Amino acid sequence: GMNPEKDFLQFDCALSYGLVEYLRILEMLNEHGWSSRRCIPHGGHQMSLNIAAGLALHGNESYPGVFQPFGGFADNYAVEDGYVRLPDIPGIGFEAKSDLYSLLSSIGK
């Protein structure tokens, strides 16, 4: 079985659950002995990175360059030695991903 002291769990907070449901999942897991630091957001994108940082989780799945324009992180923010910085802009940081921002802007017109 799964061990809350050894195993890590991944939930796709952006595409399936959203932040509110992700928080509910963390609360339920906590009631069953799991630390939120054993949960790594699935997705490898800017929203998961922000959720991991905002909730002080143990990490974030990362695969830059895949599933573009949604995957990966803000432009000019490279993964170095296993770390990536958050963009210095308000919000999730989608505006700092030029290809994604262009796509979403064109849909909204």
Annotate each predicted stretch with a short phrase:
Residues F67-K109:
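C-terminal extensions of enzymes
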